[in-house]
Amino acid sequence: MVPQALLFVPLLVFPLCFGKFPIYTIPDKLGPWSPIDIHHLSCPNNLVVEDEGCTNLSGFSYMELKVGYISAIKMNGFTCTGVVTEAETYTNFVGYVTTTFKRKHFRPTPDACRAAYNWKMAGDPRYEESLHNPYPDYHWLRTVKTTKESLVIISPSVADLDPYDRSLHSRVFPGGNCSGVAVSSTYCSTNHDYTIWMPENPRLGMSCDIFTNSRGKRASKGSETCGFVDERGLYKSLKGACKLKLCGVLGLRLMDGTWVAMQTSNETKWCPPGQLVNLHDFRSDEIEHLVVEELVKKREECLDALESIMTTKSVSFRRLSHLRKLVPGFGKAYTIFNKTLMEADAHYKSVRTWNEIIPSKGCLRVGGRCHPHVNGVFFNGIILGPDGNVLIPEMQSSLLQQHMELLVSSVIPLMHPLADPSTVFKNGDEAEDFVEVHLPDVHERISGVDLGLPNWGKYVLLSAGALTALMLIIFLMTCWRRVNRSEPTQHNLRGTGREVSVTPQSGKIISSWESYKSGGETGL
């Protein structure tokens, strides 16, 4: 993080940044001097604009930071994780089913995440049903895979919103920040590819509820706006203001560090990068009310001094000090040279420390150089003492100094990294600790016949089956050949039995048993 001291550098570089709440005011532009009568003396109205003759006051509305607005704007969101739950079943030969669940991840789409979040927030039973594992299917001797693509919604997941560039800061984001949330892109990537972060409210601008409408008086000269009197009665000049967006709302950062949004035709430059604004809290409001009361009191003291001058017809350096303008801007300076009352137009600037205007003994710095004195007299009651030191009759009230210190300390840091360790994701595959399944459609895939063997076992089984088939073929072929040999042998044996010749004892050849029988009978 940026060191807190560095955040104040822009305010310390420019003395005018402390604007309406200095410890003292002194002209940075002065002259020329001209003699006047005591009837030309007047008290400055520090609550009404006197810049460049802008005296036309009219009521108007403007927007400022809410009272009680804190530096870290919390934005509620949720994380959406894509999960694929796979149920794998195998049914063996005897019908025994084995089920194995596996879990993988995928990157979800923002639209699907928003729909799932709405389901969860509305209490839709479909979200509760989606938390179950997929119901597995099974087939005999086959491996069946049933998958569910689920969306896991975890809420709340709080991020810090930077009002300057509308970036988000949390440890769940890569590098701790996300600057891509806009109308066209309503999600942030996280430290895991399968998880995205989305704001609970799809309209990001509604989450930046830090503004309030106020009423005041606009000070203008023609079409040019010089400044305005705020709702608490304190005048704020637009001189030196710059344009600055907070939460996408265009406004003006004034020289005192406050931020307002108001319509003006003035040409205004953009603020430099890294420019900060002051917070608006109850304490600053209370002090500003006290400042207004103090300025009113100072004006009453000035009027009393002016009345004393008119009554006694005499002027002193102490009384002239009451006529000094107490806030930066255009006004008058008064002095007495050679018993003559003198007046000069002046533009006052704020002073933070006395060393700024009294850098050394006897030197009153005005406009960057030591201002000459006339017989030990400067202006506005400032004189040179007998010892050669510059004597200033009074200084601003302690309330103004207190308010100035408050404005210096109340700035919005540029970065607001979330320090809540409960939302830090773990490395590796440990993200499954927070995964709860959200169920979309079911997809089934049925494999071929599977005996449940590993790859090497399948090859052994195929080899054994091929060998067995080969042996069976050889056996069948052998049997077939034996059958073919036995049939011709039996046929030949039957033919020989009918044609065989028998030789009797008499030596006569008998062709057959029948011939032998008939011959024997005849002989007999």
UniProtKB/Swiss-Prot annotation:
Coiled coil: none
Localization (cell): Virion membrane
Residue spans, topological domain Virion surface: 20-459
Lipidation feature positions (S-palmitoyl cysteine): 479
Post-translational modification: Glycosylated and palmitoylated by host. Glycosylation is crucial for glycoprotein export at the cell surface.
Gene Ontology BP, a term: entry receptor-mediated virion attachment to host cell
Intravirion domain ranges by topology: 481-524
Signal sequence residues: 1-19
Main location: virion
Positions bearing carbohydrate: 56, 266, 338
Gene Ontology CC annotations of this record: membrane; viral envelope; viral membrane; virion membrane
Membrane topology label: Single-pass type I membrane protein
SUPFAM superfamilies registered for this protein in UniProt: Viral glycoprotein ectodomain-like
Annotated InterPro entries: PH_Rhabdo_glycop (IPR055448), Rhabdo_glycop_CD (IPR055447), Rhabdo_glycop_FD (IPR001903)
Cysteine-cysteine disulfides: 43-302, 54-226, 80-113, 178-188, 208-247, 242-271, 363-370
Biotechnology: Primary surface antigen capable of inducing and reacting with virus-neutralizing antibodies. Almost all human and veterinary vaccines are based on the functional aspects of the G protein.
Chain segments annotated as transmembrane: 460-480
UniProt keyword annotations, A-Z: Disulfide bond, Glycoprotein, Lipoprotein, Membrane, Palmitate, Signal, Transmembrane, Transmembrane helix, Viral envelope protein, Virion
Family (UniProt): Belongs to the lyssavirus glycoprotein family.
Misc. comment: Arg-352 is highly involved in rabies virus pathogenicity. Its mutation dramatically attenuates the virus.
Functional summary from the UniProt entry: Attaches the virus to host cellular receptor, inducing endocytosis of the virion by using different host proteins including TFRC, GRM2 and ITGB1. In the endosome, the acidic pH induces conformational changes in the glycoprotein trimer, which trigger fusion between virus and cell membrane. There is convincing in vitro evidence that the muscular form of the nicotinic acetylcholine receptor (nAChR), the neuronal cell adhesion molecule (NCAM), and the p75 neurotrophin receptor (p75NTR) bind glycoprotein and thereby facilitate rabies virus entry into cells.
Subunit-level organization: Homotrimer. Interacts with matrix protein. Interacts with host TRFC. Interacts with host BST2; this interaction inhibits viral budding by tethering new virions to the cell surface. Interacts with host ITGB1. Interacts with host GRM2.
Protein name: Glycoprotein
Gene (UniProt): G
